[in-house]
Amino acid sequence: LYHSSNTLAFDNFFHQVGQGKTADAEMMLENSLYGLPEGSAMVTDGTNNTFQSAPALLHQKLGYTTASFHGDVPSFWNRDNAYKSFGYQYFFSKSYYPKVKDQELGYGLKDKIFMKESMHYVEQLPQPFYAKLITVTNHYPYIIDKKNTSIDAWKTGDDTVDHYIQTAHYLDQSIGEFLDYLDKSGLRQNSVIILYGDHYGISNNHRPAIAQILGKKKVTNYDLAMFQKVPFMINAPGLKGGIDHTYGGEIDVLPTLEDLLGISSNKYIQFGQDLLSKNRNQIVPFRNGDWVTPKYTKYNGDYYHTSTGKQIKNPTAKEQKQFDKIQKYVTTELGLADKVMNGDLIRFYNLPGFKKVNKKDYTYNMKKSLKKLKKDQKKHKTSVKAKNNNQSTYDDYSTDAPELKDQNPSFPD
């Protein structure tokens, strides 16, 4: 997928999360708003704040059905409340999935099981739809059972680092199965697929092992800064693909998606920039105030030339002026974002053509949600299942997940 002619892959794309990690990433991707310097904005402000989020925008502007999928409990990171504030019509969490022996590891359903079983609901969503699937197997502490491993672990002596490659490979396989299904079901031909990593894989606490992986005696702050890169890919039919070297981060995803879908983001309160714009400044702020640009990098108080990794120990007056200018921009952006979040300032902004989300319009009660899903299918008749003469395409999804072998899972009705 990374090298597909229809995939734009960004190789200088960084996570920008703080303590909220996954929740901060969701806040940025759905709203182009930074998380907070401490805690999780989705937890502290997701319930009561007003947002102009991707689900609400796409539903109101383009008539999209909106749904999020996660194989864990709905209360984790306050999703069951924050998603209502974002305007998600559906939230398919752990209770929506059949109970299968050995189906869970770590933070929820194993990826291959989760991806396949999610299609039971995806095929019922009226098109067009905006669906977010959150996988968890390739997550710290990188636990994976032997029956799901197909490559050897690293041998650095650090258990966390050593098994990372195995869970990453498992995730890759699950995405491959998912894409095969999209091809078989016909969804691939009219879908924009975005794949992203929400936060760092291996923390800075594992420096000796990181050094071994990088083939170095020791790691520098520059190495650690570059270790904050995460995958970001956009795949769509007719999209002119390639490796894009633009510097950007999670805050930029929503404006980029809006550009691809023909939505102008100029009127929205968003802190990101369109990654496809020629006029973006390519300054990538980290939540702690550090930053990366194509020319310079600041990390843990040290400055580097980004292209070479050479440390700048005694900056010239010209370089220091540049550092100060970049730092002022980063500090200002983060400070303004904090004011927007802490003060719930979007509630004062009446955006023409956008109806503020009323959280009372949404429920994720399973019985009510499934009833609504059936009603929406009959009303719109645009779902994959409806277009297939109301026959399920679930069996078209092929997986080698050993847990599902000879299983016929029963979904809640």
Walk through the language-model features, giving the residues of each:
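Solvent-exposed soluble domains appended to multi-pass membrane proteins
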Residues: 1-413
